[in-house]
Swiss-Prot record:
InterPro entries named among the record's database cross-references: Ribosomal_uL16, Ribosomal_uL16_bact-type, Ribosomal_uL16_CS, Ribosomal_uL16_dom, Ribosomal_uL16_sf
UniProt subunit comment: Part of the 50S ribosomal subunit.
Family: Belongs to the universal ribosomal protein uL16 family.
Regions of compositional bias (Basic residues) in chain numbering: 7-17
Protein role: Binds 23S rRNA and is also seen to make contacts with the A and possibly P site tRNAs.
UniProt xrefs under Pfam families: Ribosomal_L16 (PF00252)
Highest rank taxon of the organism: Bacteria
Organismal lineage: Bacteria, Pseudomonadati, Chlorobiota, Chlorobiia, Chlorobiales
Example GO molecular function: structural constituent of ribosome
Protein name: Large ribosomal subunit protein uL16
Originating organism: Chlorobaculum parvum (strain DSM 263 / NCIMB 8327)
Keywords: Ribonucleoprotein, Ribosomal protein, RNA-binding, rRNA-binding, tRNA-binding
Amino acid sequence: MLMPKRVQYRKTQRGRMKGNAQRGTAVTFGSFGLKALEPAWITSRQIEAARVAMNRYMKRDGKIWIRIFPDKPVTKKPAETRMGSGKGNPEFWVAVVKPGRIMFEAAGVPREIAQEAFRLAAKKLPIKTRFIVRPDYEG
């Protein structure tokens, strides 16, 4: 599962997801991409599940790029604990994804196979997505 090796602060504030993505909105590495249409926290488990689904369908042909990284720790207090007594311990890691962000890219496979692989990956994610083709793609 994806997570940072080291972090400056063990616990972070939740923050808010305002506006659209400013960076990572163009398909740059591959020929096809999966674009987020909604804001969300994507967990490292969801990223891994989507990656596995794509790899299985593509039968390890082509190449996949993961363009998001879970660098935000989400804390949780233990069950049946009273309120107060500090912030809970980090439980899992999330990537903050805003609308317009390219989350996954693929190359080296036909368009139909990439589209189906991204459809299977999108089922593993909690947001609406769209299949994107690089503008200069010659299929």
